[in-house]
A protein has these predicted regions:
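Aromatic pocket-lining residues of Rossmann-like dinucleotide-binding sites
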Residues: 153
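Sterically constrained small-residue positions within well-ordered secondary structures
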Residues: 32-34, 64, 120, 218, ...
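Post-Walker A alpha-helix
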Residues: 149-150
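Extreme N-terminal, non-catalytic leader segments
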Residues: 74-77, 83-132
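Glycine-rich, often acidic-flanked micro-motifs
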Residues: 2-26, 127, 131-141, 156-333
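Short charge-dense sequence patches
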Residues: 53-67, 97-103, 224-232, 252-260
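Long, basic/Gly/Ser/Thr-rich N-terminal segments
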Residues: 1-94, 98, 307-333
Length: 333
């Protein structure tokens, strides 16, 4: 374990010590008196040849090995990662052509997510934003528009709590995580940003990072007020329900949808955290309303629509689906 002196990074209520790899996406923190009670995470390069063998497990894949307290991840043509006991991430660069940013991209996703799961955290795949001391979490499949929504809300006075990985404490607080937003080239242009002035998330990709001064971030854990499942929908459809926020009232449907938004369910199962994760999701479902959030196609239309919404209250006050839709939810759940 590293000592807690000097310059470190901070996220998810933890101190991250990475002397060999700069991780600019994580906020810097100068450790002072009274900070010794914060858990410190060690991030270091390490040759995989020295890693002990793991017995084959039921959740292994060609690129993943999992045992209790030990997860190994191989990213083709990038590198390998080993996450142990919720306190350490070892990384190995596949070859000299792999940049530090390439390593950071995967380290801050699957590796950090695995470490949080090892520590017993409930981790959702989404974005978290704060306003007036309360948080919302927006979830959805890859490409649903989570990052675009996060940036649009930030332009309307919200502050970013976390991107991609959202960790929720047992008492329902959303922890400040990784304060960055990733935008594709077209989205960056639509927000009047110059992609040439933004670092790409990986070499050769037309997806860019907004971090540091480009992001208004929240720095304190805050209560979770609402959960949203986002999807793109044309608001000129004749269906009157298409443009309204709909609360998911079926307990069975809500449980299934929340479970599907947990970060890397295979990690959860392989690390032996499924029971703990199930209880955390059930507790979250009982406390926080879940609703679908239909985003208009096009950034300008989405921004205009969002200005008319009160997302802190909308999930709780929204009506449920029509009876026929409720029946369909029960069948699919």
């Amino acid at each position: 374990m590293p000592g807690v002196t000097g310059q470190h990074r901070e996220a998810f209520g933890l101190i991250w010590h990475s002397p060999a790899l700069d991780i600019p996406e994580l906020p810097e923190r100068l450790i002072g008196p009274g900070s010794g009670d914060r858990a410190a995470i060690d991030i270091a390069p390490e040759a995989p040849e020295g890693w002990p063998d793991l017995p084959p497990g039921p959740h292994d894949t060609p690129f993943l090995q999992i045992a209790r307290g030990d997860l190994r991840l191989t990213v083709e043509d990038i590198g390998r990662f080993r996450i142990t006991d919720g306190v350490r991430i070892a990384w190995h660069r596949q070859h000299s052509g792999v940049s530090d940013q390439d390593i950071c991209t995967f380290l801050l996703g699957s590796a950090v997510g695995a470490l949080l799961i090892q520590r017993g955290s409930l981790v959702l795949h989404g974005n978290a934003l704060e306003k007036d001391g309360q948080a919302i979490v927006c979830m959805g499949h890859s490409g649903a528009g989570k990052s675009t929504l996060a940036y649009a809300l930030m332009q309307q006075g919200w502050r970013l709590l976390a991107d991609d990985l959202v960790a929720i404490s047992p008492d329902g607080l959303v922890l400040p995580g990784i304060p960055r937003i990733k935008l594709w080239h077209d989205a960056a242009k639509a927000f009047d940003l110059d992609p040439l002035q933004l670092p790409p998330i990986r070499q050769g990709m037309h997806k860019y990072l907004l971090m540091g001064e480009a992001v208004q971030r929240a720095t304190e854990a805050v209560p979770l007020q609402a959960l949203y499942l986002i999807h793109q929908h044309r608001h000129d459809t004749p269906d009157p329900d298409a443009s309204r926020i709909i609360r998911i009232t079926s307990q069975k449907a809500a449980a299934l949808r929340l479970r599907n938004q947990a970060f890397r369910p295979r990690f959860v199962r392989g690390l032996g955290q499924e029971g703990l994760n199930f209880m955390a999701l059930a507790r979250l479902q009982s406390r926080v309303p879940l609703a679908s959030l239909p985003l208009p196609a096009g950034i300008a239309a989405m921004q205009d629509w969002l200005e008319r919404q009160d997302l802190l209250q909308a999930a709780a006050t929204a009506e449920g689906p029509a009876l026929a839709q409720q029946d369909a939810e029960m069948v699919t759940a």
